[in-house]
Curated annotation (Swiss-Prot):
Keywords: Cell cycle, Cell division, Chaperone, Cytoplasm, Isomerase, Rotamase
Places the protein is found: Cytoplasm
Stretches with biased composition (Acidic residues): 444-469
Family of the protein in this entry: Belongs to the FKBP-type PPIase family. Tig subfamily.
Organism (species): Mycolicibacterium smegmatis (strain ATCC 700084 / mc(2)155) (Mycobacterium smegmatis)
Gene (name only): tig
Protein name: Trigger factor
Cell division listed as a keyword: yes
Gene Ontology terms, MF aspect: peptidyl-prolyl cis-trans isomerase activity; protein folding chaperone; ribosome binding
Alphabetical list of PROSITE patterns matching this protein: FKBP_PPIASE (PS50059)
Length: 469
């Protein structure tokens, strides 16, 4: 087999492949074996008919078609391997020549990972917000904790924000009742915004057994997207009484004896949350800094595939009704043109980021260990409420293990980029990135070596104990 590569663009190639028929003999053998199982000839057991008789029965063309269909994927893969290409997506294959007993010639056009010139990672400078915990933030956490231990008490006044109400609802569209909108005794926290638009504004000030009608747009059901006249009746009003923030409350709500100790723990809690947010900011800014300093050619077909997927998901729930989709966007203060522009921008950035991270990973020779994969599987299992083995089976069935592997590798790559960069806050303080991004590659290697040494020493000690016994 002979193959050559034409560079059509920085992200696309055409592979020309020539396969002499002598190399297709194993493919012919397999094809005839398969066809022999499918075709029954008098006097021969299934699978035992001679090749000449089979060919005479089904025709040479059918045999050639089977051989070519079976041969193309493997010959394409072989050409990719020998050319040291890194394809993205599926190829577009065209048979340009097929001469029986002579040769098979085909071309395969495919997007590839482009060559990317990377900046020196040590030159990257990342600046993020400092971690500051204010009294107001701690007070908000304490207030939230008090609310969890609050009690509800009935009141006879009008509804206020923060109250808990029991309500009846009914709705009509153009005078027609909407059965699915009718409900009785529905519990609702006023101001939460969890129900239909306009409800909270309508019931503010109402007392028990008072009603009000307002207009809102339905978001689901037969009349989705249409204006409805909704009538709400307040059945009861309750306010939440909060416990006093004292030592007694601290003992009730936590493991601490005093309110001061509880507040200190809330300070630590807020600081941990802000540390996570800071780590996310570091990650995002590291990627942004790399993107700003690096030219990344974009494979258009890969970008378009991402765009198509986003559009499909957006209109799938609307039965792919473009008109309804346009109306939905208009209600959100947007348009199809704006949606398409935003979708393309996001898709281009996503593809650029993936290509860039893969290029950095190759340069740094990032390796994914079994422990890295196990940690990700355990984390995902907890998120989805599955056993790790169940999750592995699902990922295998959906062919998602390679994507998970690539995602883990990119995560390790981002960590390596962060370690190489200079990371400071806006006050000029250098930030220790160890907690959220792990040890640097060098430190990780040292830790791994130490673990191996410790394990070896432990095994040696066990062997010595066994010998003594």
């Amino acid at each position: 087999m002979k193959s050559t590569v034409e560079q059509l663009s920085p992200t696309r190639v055409r592979i020309n492949v020539e396969v002499p028929f002598t190399e297709l003999e194993p493919d012919f053998d397999r094809a005839f074996k398969e066809l022999a199982k499918q075709v029954r000839l008098p006097g021969f057991r299934p699978g035992k008919a001679p090749r000449k008789l089979l060919e005479a029965r089904i025709g040479r063309g059918a045999v050639l078609e089977q051989v070519v269909n079976d041969a193309l994927p493997s010959r394409y893969s072989e050409a990719v391997s020998t050319s040291d290409l890194k394809p993205l997506g599926q190829p577009e294959i065209e048979i340009t020549k097929l001469e029986d007993n002579e040769e098979l010639v085909f071309t395969a056009e495919v997007d590839i990972r482009p060559e990317i010139t990377l900046p020196e990672l040590e030159s990257l400078k990342i600046t993020v917000d400092p971690i500051e915990v204010t009294d107001e933030e701690v007070d908000a956490e304490l207030q939230s904790l008090r609310a969890r231990f609050g009690t509800l008490k009935g009141v006879e006044r009008g509804v206020q924000e923060g109250d808990f109400v029991s309500i009846d609802l009914s709705a009509t569209v153009d005078g027609n009742e909407v059965p699915e909108a009718a409900t009785e005794g529905l519990s609702h926290e006023v101001g939460s915004g969890q129900l239909i638009d306009g409800l909270d504004e309508a019931i503010i000030g109402l007392k028990a057994d008072e009603s009000k009608t307002f207009t809102t747009k339905l978001v689901a059901g037969e009349y989705a997207g249409q204006d409805a006249e909704v009538t709400v009746t307040v059945k009861s009003v309750k306010e939440r009484e909060l416990p006093e923030p004292d030592d007694e409350f601290a003992q009730l709500a936590s493991e601490y004896d005093t309110i001061e100790e509880l507040r200190n723990s809330l300070v630590d809690q807020v600081r941990r949350l802000k540390s996570v947010q800071q780590a996310e900011q570091i990650r995002d800014k590291a990627i942004e800094a790399l993107l700003e300093q690096t030219e990344v050619p974009l494979p258009e077909k890969i970008v378009q595939a991402q765009i198509d997927e986003v559009v499909h998901n957006a209109i799938h729930g609307l039965d792919h009704d473009e008109e309804k989709f346009a109306e939905q966007l208009a209600e959100q203060g947007s348009s199809r043109e704006e949606f398409d522009a935003e979708t393309r921008t996001e898709a281009e950035k996503a593809v650029k980021t993936q290509l860039l991270m893969d290029a950095v990973a190759d340069k740094l020779e990032i390796q994914v260990s079994q422990n890295d994969l196990t940690e990700r599987l355990v984390l995902m299992s907890r998120q989805y409420g599955l056993e790790p083995q169940q999750l592995i089976q699902i990922l295998q069935q959906n062919n998602q293990l390679p994507a998970m592997f690539a995602d883990v590798r990119r995560g390790l790559t981002i960590a390596a980029v962060v370690h190489a960069a200079t990371v400071t806050d806006t006050d000029g303080n250098v930030i220790d990135t160890m907690e959220f991004f792990g040890p640097s590659g060098e430190q990780a290697a040292e830790d791994s070596a130490e673990e191996s040494t410790d394990a070896a020493e432990g095994e040696a000690a066990e062997d010595a104990d066994d010998t003594d016994k």
